[in-house]
Regions:
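Fungal secretory targeting signals
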Residues: 1-18
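Disordered, acidic Ser/Thr/Pro-rich linker "stalks" and the adjacent N-terminal cap
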Residues: 514-600, 609-620, 648, 680-682
Length: 684
C-alpha cells in the first residue's frame, strides 16, 4: 500500500487527448494489489494532490471492506474487524449502506453492489437496526448502470422495509420520529437535553430532518422503481403520495424560521423537554433534506447554507461541526472506552454528515436555480469544503491516510482513535468527486449531463476516465490553460468510437446518449473456506504455530487488506522463523495453515494473500505448496498444481486438479528471521 505520500501522476498524449497511464498510477497507489483495481475503478487525477491521493485511498477503503461471505457473495462492512453491535455472523450494519452503494455504483464490477443489496434486503440482514436510505441508493445505482432487473427484483423487499417503520410514524404529526442512537448519531441536542444534560447516549426521541428525508427518498425510489417495472400504478401513486406528504410536513413543521434551518422537534416528553417543541440549536443534520432533494427551491430555505459557511456556527477550522459552539454542551465529552473518548455528535466532525452535506450541496448547486441565484453558496465553496474533507483523511500526527470515526473541529485530530476506528467505511468520497467535482449527474433519461462543480482558480486541471454510465465508458477532463493535457477547457469523451465534445467553460452540458445494456457482473467463484465468525464450527482453521481460533479465524474470514499499520493488522500471524526443521514449534523452517471444511468438498484453486512490511518485520514466504488430506488420513501434495510466484501485499493464485477432501493445507517456507502474516487463504 503506497498512500502516505502525494504522487505526481503520469499522463500520455494520444491523438491529441490525454490518457491516464493506468498501470503506472495503480502500481504507485496500490503496489502488488494493483490487479484488483485494474478493471474495476475509474481513474482520476487533478491539480490538487490531496484530492487525488484521497480518491485512490478511498478505493483502498472500498476494497478493504468488501467482505466475502462465500455463497452469499460480498457485503460492504463499516469496520475492518468485528464489533459487538454488528449483525452476526455476517458483520453487517445498515446505517452507512447508502454511502457504500453510492461509492459502489462507480465500480465497474457490479457484483459488489448487487451482492450487497441482495444481502441487505434479505431476512438475514438487520434492516431496522438504524435509519437508512437504502432504497434511494439502489435507485441511484440504477441511474448509473441502467440495469432494470437489478432494481425491480428488490421492489417487494423495499416495501416491506419501508412499511416496518410505521411503528415510528406519528399519524397526528405526519412525521417519523427516531431515537438519535438509532439514527446513528448519539449525543445530539435532543438526547442530551432530554437527559437534563447528564448523558445522551440513548433517549431523546425526536422528529428529525434525517429520518424523514430518508423515508421521503425511499418512497420516491419505490415509486420510481414501480413505474419502471410497469403495471403497478397503485404502488406508484401510494408512494409518490407518501413522499409528497413527507416533503410538505418537513417543510411546514421542521423548518425553523428563527434559526433558518431544518431542526428537530421533540417526540419525548419529560421533566426536561416538551413534546413537539423545537430543539434549541442548529445541527448539521438539518442539511440532510438537500441530500435527498426534499426542499422546494425557495430563497427562504437557501439561507440554511449560510450557516454551513459561518465559522462561529457549523464551519470549523478543520471541518464541518455537527453542532454549534453556542450550544451549552458543545464538545462536552460524556462517554469513554477506558480512557479513550467515545463517539458523540455534539460538535465533532463526522465524515458521515460531511458526505451528506457535500452531496446535498452538489444537488443545490446543480438544480436549485432560485437558491443559487442568491449567491449564498457557490462552487468555490464546494471546492473548499471538499478539499478540507480530503485533508481530514490524512492524520496530521502521522502523515498517513487513515480515515477514522470523528474529529476535533479545531485541530482535525481523531477523537475516538480506538483500534476499531482505522480506515473506517462510514461515509463517501469518490461519489462526491465523480458526481460533484467532475460533474457527471446520473439520470434516468437517455442523456449524459455534465456539470462540474469546482473553483477554476483552485483546480486548474482534472481528468476522470473509465467511468461507467448507461453501458458506456465516459471520460471528463478540464484544463484551464491547455498546458497540461494539450486541450483547453472542458472535454467529454464517450467510448472509443465517438467524437469528442468540448467547450471552453466548465458549465453544464447535456448530451443525448442512448443507453447500452449494462455490462454483466464479473464471474466470481464461490469461496468455500469462509468462517463467518469464531463461533461457527466449520470451516475452521488450524496452524502449525499460533494455533487458536482467534488467530486462525482472521485468515479465513473473507477480508483482504494490506494497510501497513499495526492497528490495522489482518490475518493469522506466525512468529519469527529460524533454521531448524521442526514443523510444530516456533522454530519451524516449514509452516502450515490448514482448513477443515467439516465435510468432503471439491477444491481446485486458491487465492492466497501474504502481508509484507519491513518496518513490522513481516515477509512473504519464499515458496509454498498445497496439500489435501487423503482417504487414508495422510497428507499429500495436490496433483496438477500450477503455482504462481509468491506476491507480497497482493493475491497469489494457485490451481490444481480438482479433488474431494475434508481438509486442505497451505505449506510454506518463511524467510529466516522474519514473521509471516497470512492475510487470507481463500479456497474454491
Amino acid at each position: 500500500m503506497k498512500l502516505a505520500t502525494s504522487l505526481a501522476l503520469s499522463s500520455v498524449i494520444h491523438q491529441g487527448l490525454a490518457i491516464l497511464d493506468s498501470k503506472a498510477i495503480l502500481s504507485k497507489y496500490f503496489g502488488n494489489d494493483a490487479p484488483w483495481y485494474q478493471d474495476r475503478i475509474p481513474l482520476f487525477e487533478s491539480s490538487d494532490a490531496d484530492l487525488t491521493d484521497t480518491y485512490y485511498y478511498r478505493w483502498s477503503i472500498f476494497r478493504a471492506h468488501q467482505r466475502d461471505l462465500g455463497a452469499y457473495g460480498f457485503i460492504s462492512t463499516e469496520f475492518l474487524n468485528d464489533v459487538s453491535w454488528q449483525t452476526k455472523p455476517w458483520a453487517s450494519l445498515n446505517d452507512a449502506t447508502g454511502f457504500h452503494l453510492l461509492e459502489a455504483r462507480w465500480c465497474r464490477d457490479r457484483r459488489f453492489k448487487e451482492d450487497y443489496a441482495n444481502f441487505m434486503y434479505s431476512k438475514d440482514s438487520n434492516r431496522r437496526q438504524f435509519s437508512e436510505s437504502m432504497a434511494s441508493a439502489v435507485w441511484d445505482g440504477y441511474l448509473v448502470d441502467g440495469s432494470v432487473s437489478d432494481v425491480t427484483k428488490r421492489l417487494d423487499a423495499m416495501q416491506v422495509v419501508y412499511e416496518a417503520w410505521k411503528d415510528s410514524y406519528d399519524t397526528s404529526k405526519g412525521l417519523y420520529w427516531v431515537e438519535p442512537l438509532r439514527d446513528a448519531t448519539e449525543y445530539t441536542i435532543s438526547s442530551i437535553d432530554a437527559s437534563g444534560g447528564l448523558d445522551g447516549f440513548t433517549g431523546g426521541e425526536a422528529f428529525r430532518p434525517t429520518i424523514n428525508s430518508y423515508q421521503y427518498a425511499n418512497a420516491r425510489a419505490i415509486a420510481n422503481i414501480a413505474a419502471l417495472k410497469g403495471g403497478l400504478d397503485s404502488t406508484v401513486s401510494t408512494y409518490n403520495s407518501r413522499a409528497e406528504a413527507l416533503k410538505q410536513r418537513v417543510q411546514d413543521a421542521l423548518w425553523n424560521s428563527t434559526f433558518e434551518h431544518f431542526i428537530d422537534r421533540f417526540k419525548v416528553n419529560n421533566q426536561n423537554v416538551t413534546y413537539w417543541n423545537f430543539i434549541r440549536g442548529r445541527e448539521l443534520a438539518g442539511m440532510v433534506p438537500w441530500t435527498h432533494d426534499l426542499p422546494d427551491d425557495k430563497v427562504e430555505y437557501a439561507q440554511a447554507w449560510s450557516h454551513v459557511l459561518n465559522s462561529s456556527q457549523l464551519s470549523g477550522p478543520a471541518g464541518l461541526r455537527t453542532g454549534e459552539p453556542s450550544y451549552q454542551y458543545y464538545m462536552r465529552q460524556y462517554r469513554y472506552e477506558g480512557k479513550n473518548p467515545e463517539c458523540q455528535w455534539n460538535g465533532p466532525v463526522w465524515p458521515f454528515q460531511y458526505t451528506q452535506v457535500l452531496s446535498g450541496l452538489a444537488n443545490f448547486l446543480d438544480h436549485y436555480p432560485n437558491g443559487t441565484q442568491t449567491g449564498v453558496i457557490t462552487p468555490k465553496d464546494y471546492t473548499a469544503m471538499l478539499r478540507k474533507y480530503a485533508k481530514l483523511h490524512r492524520n496530521p500526527s502521522t502523515g498517513i491516510l487513515d480515515l477514522e470515526e470523528d474529529y476535533h473541529p479545531d485541530t482535525g485530530l481523531p477523537i475516538v482513535g480506538l483500534k476499531r476506528s482505522h480506515h473506517y467505511f462510514h461515509s463517501g468520497f469518490n461519489d462526491l468527486i465523480i458526481s460533484g467535482l467532475v460533474g457527471l449527474r446520473p439520470s434516468a433519461s437517455d442523456i449524459l449531463v455534465v456539470n462540474p462543480l469546482f473553483d477554476p482558480s483552485t483546480i486548474t486541471y482534472f481528468r476522470a476516465e473509465r467511468i461507467p454510465y448507461h453501458g458506456h465508458t465516459i471520460a471528463i477532463q478540464w484544463d484551464a490553460s491547455g498546458s497540461h493535457y494539450g486541450s483547453r477547457g472542458l472535454v467529454i469523451e464517450i467510448d472509443d468510437d465517438n467524437p469528442v465534445i468540448s467547450q471552453p467553460t466548465a458549465s453544464r452540458i447535456s448530451i443525448p446518449l442512448p443507453r447500452k445494456p449494462a455490462p454483466a457482473p464479473f464471474t466470481t467463484r464461490i469461496a468455500k473456506s469462509i468462517q463467518l465468525n469464531t463461533t461457527v464450527p466449520f470451516p475452521r482453521g488450524m496452524a502449525s504455530v499460533a494455533n487458536s481460533t482467534s488467530n486462525t479465524y482472521a485468515a479465513i474470514d473473507g477480508r483482504v487488506w494490506f494497510f501497513d499499520t499495526q492497528d490495522a493488522a489482518n490475518g493469522w500471524e506466525a512468529p519469527v522463523a529460524t533454521t531448524t526443521t521442526t514443523t510444530t514449534t516456533n522454530d519451524a523452517a516449514e509452516m502450515w495453515f490448514e482448513i477443515d471444511f467439516g465435510q468432503q468438498v471439491s477444491v481446485g484453486s486458491a487465492e492466497i494473500a501474504f502481508f509484507q512490511s519491513k518496518s513490522q518485520g513481516f515477509a512473504a514466504p519464499t515458496q509454498y505448496r498445497v496439500q489435501v488430506l487423503g482417504q487414508g488420513g495422510s497428507w499429500g501434495d495436490v496433483e496438477g498444481a500450477m503455482y504462481a510466484e509468491v506476491v507480497a501485499n497482493g493475491i497469489t493464485e494457485a490451481e490444481w486438479k480438482s479433488v474431494q477432501s475434508q481438509k486442505v493445507r497451505l505449506v510454506f517456507t518463511p524467510v529466516v528471521g522474519e514473521k509471516v502474516r497470512l492475510v487470507e487463504f481463500k479456497v474454491f
